């Protein structure tokens, strides 16, 4: 993640927010509408505990801005914030809107086996543009 810079688009997402210390990418995979990954763009760290208090405060404020914007645009019943890092050791947070009709309400979100299909392009573009405006 450090080496990729701060692109507007990647193979896996469209950037909807470029903050002081983070970028947020709306995911192309059709896992859940609004699924976004917020990536720490300061010095390389793998865990949030490696951030200074000031860095942590700035990251969380930007992360909350993304979450609030997803809530305002999509109206989920809940938003999950997941810091994993098992397969990619760079600080990033999965922001997963949850809806009343999602596959497992009240439980962790079930990720599909294998590569999920892409999100419908027109809906992805419309959501990305709306979220950028709201940021």
Question: What does each of the following model-derived ranges do?
Answer:
Residues 1-135:
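HIT superfamily nucleotide-processing domains
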């Amino acid at each position: 993640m450090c080496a990729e810079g701060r692109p507007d688009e990647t193979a896996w997402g469209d950037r909807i927010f470029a903050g002081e210390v983070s970028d947020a990418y709306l995911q192309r995979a059709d896992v859940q509408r609004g699924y976004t990954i917020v990536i720490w763009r300061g010095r390389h760290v793998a865990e949030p505990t490696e951030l200074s208090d000031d860095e942590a405060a700035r990251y969380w404020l930007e992360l909350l801005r993304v979450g609030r914007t997803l809530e305002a645009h999509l109206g989920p019943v809940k938003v999950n914030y997941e810091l994993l890092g098992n397969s990619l050791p760079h600080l990033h947070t999965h922001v997963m809107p949850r809806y009343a009709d999602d596959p497992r309400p009240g439980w962790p979100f079930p990720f599909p086996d294998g590569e999920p299909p892409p999100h419908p392009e027109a809906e992805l573009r419309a959501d990305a543009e709306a979220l950028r405006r709201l940021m």
